Amino acid sequence: MKVTFEQLKEAFNRVLLARGVAAETADACAEMFARTTESGVYSHGVNRFPRFIQQLDNGDIIPDARPQRITSLGAIEQWDAQRAIGNLTAKKMMDRAIELASDHGIGLVALRNANHWMRGGSYGWQAAEKGYIGICWTNSIAVMPPWGSKECRIGTNPLIVAIPSSPITMIDMSMSMFSYGMLEVNRLAGRELPVDGGFDDEGNLTKEPGVIEKNRRILPMGYWKGSGLSIVLDMIATLLSDGASVAEVTQENSDEYGVSQIFIAIEVDKLIDGATRDAKLQRIMDFVTTAERADENVAIRLPGHEFTRLRDENRRNGITVDDSVWAKIQAL
């Protein structure tokens, strides 16, 4: 089915207000969920909203909490999220990293006791729109087996890097081949994954999203490389925030909350003039996209360049929402 941005935001807002969330907070949160969905990231927008409400109802998310700064070391700050709403807190932390970068050239905010930030790419994009390089990542509950294991002991720990090119170039990737959100998107659409995304119950690689969702044997990106990168990202976020690691979140909490996150902004224009910056970025993009195609009918893509197109298409044609997901939201 198709809905407008306004219908989507109103539905989110209604559910939040019904749970006693302050009007200003509810409006800002609903706006972010709707913008994420409008950008084509359904897995962490509309599809994720019922799960967000479940955690709100369970008390994992504290909607009236206010993040507090704990430590300030010039370009580096440490904050405690107080388990406030994840996407609103993450937006505030990247804003703070940008403020620090405007003073120091680089700003780093380490956040502990945070909630799921929904679409991590929103915060990298936020920095790049203002002319900064944006880098951020989060740890999570253990939802992926380390390479060589059957048992979930590491997080998908998504990493975002956004570059202020024109258009913005951005990677937003979990350390698994597919996020659990994308497994859901493909399952709901009745599609196999385009490449292997995990293991079946017999230990064979599989493209069946429903099987992987059920047995939790999701495949690390790049096999042992994604497994290793997940571990070191967890270590850095834990140390800099003095927060909870994947092990602590998994073993000590009843669900995925109280995670640790990193937000970095770099002011490129302190290091290079604008014309030179743009020329260098354009040369990189042209060099990549003019490579000989493996399939003449399939263009070579640059990461993140599709989001502006998807947003514009959704604004023109309406936003596609799975019927079962919309029914869940209407019933909340």
Swiss-Prot record:
Its EC number is 1.1.1.130. It holds the Pfam family Ldh_2. Transmembrane segments: none annotated. It is an enzyme of class 1 (oxidoreductase). It catalyses: 3-dehydro-L-gulonate + NAD(+) = 2,3-dioxo-L-gulonate + NADH + H(+); 3-dehydro-L-gulonate + NADP(+) = 2,3-dioxo-L-gulonate + NADPH + H(+). One of its GO terms (molecular function) is NAD+ binding. Keywords: Cytoplasm, NAD, Oxidoreductase. The active site is at residue 44. InterPro entries: Diketo_gul_Rdtase (IPR023689), Mal/L-sulf/L-lact_DH-like_ah (IPR043144), Mal/L-sulf/L-lact_DH-like_NADP (IPR043143), Mal/L-sulfo/L-lacto_DH-like_sf (IPR036111), Malate/L-lactate_DH-like (IPR003767). NCBIfam families: PRK13260.1. HAMAP family: Diketo_gul_reduc. Homodimer. This is 2,3-diketo-L-gulonate reductase. It comes from Citrobacter koseri (strain ATCC BAA-895 / CDC 4225-83 / SGSC4696). The gene is dlgD.
